[in-house]
Amino acid sequence: MAKRDYYEVLGVAKNASDDEIKKAYRKLAMKYHPDRNPDNKDAEEHFKEVKEAYEMLSDSQKRAAYDQYGHAGVDPNMGGAGAQGFGGFADAFGDIFGDIFGQAAGGRGGRGGPQVYRGADLRYSMEITLEQAAHGYDTQIRVPSWVSCEVCHGSGAKPGTKPETCPTCHGQGTVRMSQGFFSIQQTCPKCHGTGTYIPEPCAHCHGSGKVKETKTLEVKIPAGIDDGMRIRSAGNGEPGINGGPPGDLYVEIHIKPHAVFERDGDDLHCQMPIPFTTAALGGEIEVPTLAGRATFPVPEGTQSGKTFRLRGKGIKGLRSSIAGDLYVHVQVETPVKLTEHQRDLLKQFEKSLAEGGARHSPQSKSWFDRVKSFFE
């Protein structure tokens, strides 16, 4: 089955900003999250689709590749499980400019010897809870990594043999080609810039000199981190070529939708149901916060949809000196499954309200006045 367009999945335009994409993701993730839709396969599939679309469009490099090449430009099969390289397009352009200027993009060498390349960066996608994001979190991750082959000790050659000087470039890693009035230096097509070639490759690493293994890394997630932020682990990307420096590992953070709170920057929002008696008479209600429980007074006559602000009960962001606020949106509950006695009491209450006039229902009065003027 063909994949849907990622912008269509999130319901945003192709020129949508990062904030618009993030807000659309949060809204849909809350709607389709498995915790809110137990045993609902359709919602589960929608959630996976929304998550995949956000992972692609929230990454500027992947979004650019998707915009240009579509789904083929962000093939999830590239890279290892959990971690993905994103040096493919840079490598392609590096070859082009390296051929013209005699130096690969991000590398050095050319005249003095074989090309030296920095290793590609890797990306690891990690999902954490809102509580972990707010308070900080130390954990370990397992990522695929390349290490020196133990059989050939990193040479890439079959034991008992060794790499030989490339006969085409004589160990320089580059060759010169004349085209009319121009002399162009380009990467050697035989040794691909290494300056050597391997007549008998190692059977274990197939001549690469390295093998893939999984390594464990310590990751410290700072308190206040937000969805989509990345943590850089220097030197834990793919190894360099010909002595080049290794790339970096970027741990991209995704925060799971919360059952109670919705985050907006450093602020939190929650929906709070209250009895209609508390709304009418006033009282004190208890609300959850990330630090525990808090209470605040509800004035009498509170209407459904009223928002209360609890200062400092949000999240202290990475670049903030103070914590954000918690916004409690009150929803007045209508009682159900009433007994006959309760129904009689409510009827008496309704009658007393009618006798008291419109002063008991200010919103209804203003609404009826607007309707009346509409038909006049």
Swiss-Prot record:
Q: Which InterPro entries does this one have?
A: DnaJ, DnaJ_C, DnaJ_domain, DnaJ_domain_CS, HSP40/DnaJ_pept-bd, HSP_DnaJ_Cys-rich_dom, HSP_DnaJ_Cys-rich_dom_sf, J_dom_sf
- GO-annotated molecular function: ATP binding; heat shock protein binding; unfolded protein binding; zinc ion binding
Q: Does the keyword Metal-binding apply?
A: yes
What SUPFAM superfamilies does the database record attribute to this sequence? Chaperone J-domain, DnaJ/Hsp40 cysteine-rich domain, HSP40/DnaJ peptide-binding domain
Boundaries of each J domain copy?
Answer: 5-70
Zinc finger boundaries on the chain: CR-type: 136-214
Q: How is the cofactor bound?
A: Binds 2 Zn(2+) ions per monomer.
**Localization per record:** Cytoplasm
Source domain of life:
Bacteria
What are the CXXCXGXG motif repeat spans here? Answer: 149-156, 166-173, 188-195, 202-209
- Specify which residues bind Zn(2+) 1 according to the UniProt entry for this protein: C149, C152, C202, C205
Q: Name the cofactor(s) required for activity, per the record.
A: Zn(2+)
Which keywords accompany this UniProt record?
Answer: Chaperone, Cytoplasm, DNA replication, Metal-binding, Repeat, Stress response, Zinc, Zinc-finger
Do you know which Pfam families this protein is assigned to? Answer: DnaJ (PF00226), DnaJ_C (PF01556), DnaJ_CXXCXGXG (PF00684)
One GO CC annotation, please? cytoplasm
GO BP term, pick one: DNA replication
Main location (coarse class): cytoplasm
- Is Cytoplasm among this UniProt entry's keywords? yes
Query: Which proteins does it associate with, and in what oligomeric form?
Result: Homodimer.
Q: HAMAP family, per this entry?
A: DnaJ (MF_01152)
Q: What does this protein do?
A: Participates actively in the response to hyperosmotic and heat shock by preventing the aggregation of stress-denatured proteins and by disaggregating proteins, also in an autonomous, DnaK-independent fashion. Unfolded proteins bind initially to DnaJ; upon interaction with the DnaJ-bound protein, DnaK hydrolyzes its bound ATP, resulting in the formation of a stable complex. GrpE releases ADP from DnaK; ATP binding to DnaK triggers the release of the substrate protein, thus completing the reaction cycle.
What remark about domains does the record contain? The J domain is necessary and sufficient to stimulate DnaK ATPase activity. Zinc center 1 plays an important role in the autonomous, DnaK-independent chaperone activity of DnaJ. Zinc center 2 is essential for interaction with DnaK and for DnaJ activity.
Q: Which family does it belong to?
A: Belongs to the DnaJ family.
The name this protein carries in UniProt is: Chaperone protein DnaJ
Species of the source:
Burkholderia multivorans (strain ATCC 17616 / 249)
